[in-house]
Amino acid sequence: MHRNNRVTAPRTIAALFFALALVVGACNTAAPAASGGGAAVTCTDGQKHVSVTNTCMTDDQIKAEIAKEGGLVVGNWTYSANAVLIDEFQKYVKATYGADVKLTYEGTQAPSEYLTKLAAASKGGNPAPYDVIAVEENYWADGVTQGLVSDFLPSDLIPNQKLVLDQFQHAPTSIAFQSTAFPGVVYNKTKAPFLKTLKDLANPALKGKITLPAPGDITAGGFFLGLASELGKDYKDPAQMKEVVDWAVTNIGPNVVQYTTDQPTLQQLFESGAIDAFAFWNSTARLEYFGGHKDATLLVPGTIYPANGYLWIPKGATHPVLAQVFINWRLSPEVQFPNDWPIEHGQWSELSEGFLGPDYVSHVPDWFAADYFSYFPTLDQIKTQFKPVDWNAYNATSKEWQDYYATKIGQ
């Protein structure tokens, strides 16, 4: 989801982050096996293999096809810099392929909506309403299970695939555009200095001063994975997760003023002083801090379960060439680290979410170079210090306990 930054004194966050992180190996995640595509055609000199359509095209043919497609629809999150992102992509296509295209960039904090629409279109024999989905990894895994995901890797239109570590790829069906995203708690370190663990949200001093995620999607899911770890519960067992929900509702519930994942609401409540803490994505702490709210701090869970964004192309996408162009652009170092875009530092910190591989390390901007590793892990830490999630198990059981959570809070 929409990611933003954590905030503590320089150099202290990195130490806190990784002192608490559970070292359990690389971020390879358990996920359903992708269905194989047809054998790739053999292209001659001067041609590029274009996946999804499985055709060979010259550069001129690619340009003509992009002009013919004319645009694409991407399902993502609610970045504050979405308008700039749209403009930058459209300018890139014009400069690279000579075509004027329209990027429709949809945003939501409830990405399950995308799968619902894709499944309905597939069942009805209709074209997919999206050309690219760019949300958390668990939705890709669910999409594969439902038969909604196209094979598209490798493709000559996506040379930037080679820049991304294997642990962030599920070829042939998806590739990460984030490496360090996870749900956490953003809090005011002056008003709530006692917050050290997720269980500390039960402190009576926070009565009426926090928000928790609304049930149903990965923001709530990620929060409860972290809380389950603190309570010694197994997130793969729905009965144990219901116990985690019961604990949260009983102990944290009296402090909750609202259950929501609406980002503008969360930020308005926090910035006005109406709340002292909210459960949302780690990047929001960065956004608050760089926006001038220097007391905004990230509570890092003792066990970090990453929920990174992954790019994939739905079956039935009607603009498959532009979909691949967008994915390649999104993976480029210049977009992963949008240093030349006309955006504020807080917006930059939303769009950039860690290194995908060694070729990205040199792109940290000068204005952030001295403090970058106070807010982000090193590439080696990214490779080794996050706990992978069994998304098959999560997807198989989460609806049961998420529905239970909804019932317990009256939603």
Regions found by a protein language model. Name each.
Residues 184-191, 228-230, 307-322, 338-342:
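A bilobed periplasmic-binding-protein/Venus flytrap-type ligand-binding module shared by bacterial periplasmic
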Residues 41-137:
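Early extracytoplasmic/lumenal segment of secretory-pathway proteins
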Residues 162, 167, 180-181, 245-251, ...:
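Periplasmic-binding protein-like
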Residues 27-36:
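Bacterial lipoprotein signal-peptidase II cleavage site
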Residues 43, 376-411:
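Conserved C-terminal helix/tail region of periplasmic/extracytoplasmic solute-binding proteins
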Residues 313-382:
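Mature extracytoplasmic/periplasmic domains
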Residues 140-142, 271, 277-294:
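A ligand-binding cleft/hinge motif common to bilobed small-molecule-binding domains
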Residues 72-87, 106-115, 127-274:
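Extracytoplasmic ligand-binding site segments that recognize negatively charged/polar headgroups
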